């Protein structure tokens, strides 16, 4: 508690020795005149510097704005050119798509036509092969029938032909040949 009393008494002493902030009615003691003279000197002497600095800054800002506007114009012209190129590219792409579709249709029709021709050729080849096979089979059947007929006639002739009849046939054939010679 003694410490608290000691601190409070020191605070009272320091507040009595210090002056507080407030308005000082003594004009010369407050240095208002000195401050006014200093401020007017700064304004008078610094005006040219400040004016030239502001003019330089204003000129730089104007140049920066003009450069930005020029870049904007250039960017807009490049944008228009790019849009024109995009439109041309899209037209070319569309043309390529149409050509591709046309080519695809042509190839499809060609493949279908070739397929039909191949089917017709295979069908004709099949028919031709069947006809050849039929003719060959008919020929084989005729040969077989002829062979059977010859065998039957041979068997019948052997049964019918006697040695006496055979010599008569030979004599008859010789006499026929003798008249022709």
From Swiss-Prot:
Which top-rank group of organisms is this from? Eukaryota
* Keywords associated with the record: ATP synthesis, CF(0), Chloroplast, Hydrogen ion transport, Ion transport, Membrane, Plastid, Thylakoid, Transmembrane, Transmembrane helix, Transport
Membrane-related topology note:
Single-pass membrane protein
Location in the cell = Plastid, Chloroplast thylakoid membrane
Coiled-coil residue windows: none
Q: Which residues cross the membrane?
A: 31-50
Presence of the UniProt keyword Transmembrane helix in the record: yes
Question: What quaternary structure, including any partners, is listed in this protein's UniProt entry?
Answer: F-type ATPases have 2 components, F(1) - the catalytic core - and F(0) - the membrane proton channel. F(1) has five subunits: alpha(3), beta(3), gamma(1), delta(1), epsilon(1). F(0) has four main subunits: a(1), b(1), b'(1) and c(10-14). The alpha and beta chains form an alternating ring which encloses part of the gamma chain. F(1) is attached to F(0) by a central stalk formed by the gamma and epsilon chains, while a peripheral stalk is formed by the delta, b and b' chains.
Q: Which PANTHER family match?
A: ATP SYNTHASE SUBUNIT B, CHLOROPLASTIC (PTHR34264:SF3)
**Membership in a protein family:** Belongs to the ATPase B chain family.
Q: What else is known?
A: In plastids the F-type ATPase is also known as CF(1)CF(0).
What is the role of the protein in this entry?
F(1)F(0) ATP synthase produces ATP from ADP in the presence of a proton or sodium gradient. F-type ATPases consist of two structural domains, F(1) containing the extramembraneous catalytic core and F(0) containing the membrane proton channel, linked together by a central stalk and a peripheral stalk. During catalysis, ATP synthesis in the catalytic domain of F(1) is coupled via a rotary mechanism of the central stalk subunits to proton translocation. Component of the F(0) channel, it forms part of the peripheral stalk, linking F(1) to F(0).
Identification of the protein by name: ATP synthase subunit b, chloroplastic
Which organism does this sequence originate in? Answer: Rhodomonas salina
């Amino acid at each position: 508690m003694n410490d608290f009393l000691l601190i409070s008494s020191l605070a009272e002493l320091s507040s009595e020795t210090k002056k507080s902030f407030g308005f000082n009615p003594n004009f010369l003691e407050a240095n208002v005149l000195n401050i006014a003279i200093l401020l007017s000197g700064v304004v008078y002497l610094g005006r040219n510097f400040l004016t030239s600095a502001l003019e330089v800054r204003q000129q730089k800002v104007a140049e920066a704005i003009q450069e930005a506007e020029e870049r904007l114009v250039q960017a807009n012209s490049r944008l228009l050119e790019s849009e024109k190129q995009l439109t041309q590219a899209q037209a070319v792409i569309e043309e390529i798509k149409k050509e591709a579709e046309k080519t695809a249709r042509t190839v499809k029709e060609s493949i279908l036509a070739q397929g039909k021709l191949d089917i017709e050729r295979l069908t004709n080849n099949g028919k031709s092969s069947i006809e050849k096979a039929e003719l060959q089979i008919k020929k084989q059947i005729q040969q077989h029938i002829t062979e059977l007929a010859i065998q039957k006639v041979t068997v019948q002739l052997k049964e019918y032909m006697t040695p006496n009849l055979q010599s008569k046939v030979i004599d008859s054939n010789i006499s026929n040949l003798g008249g022709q010679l």
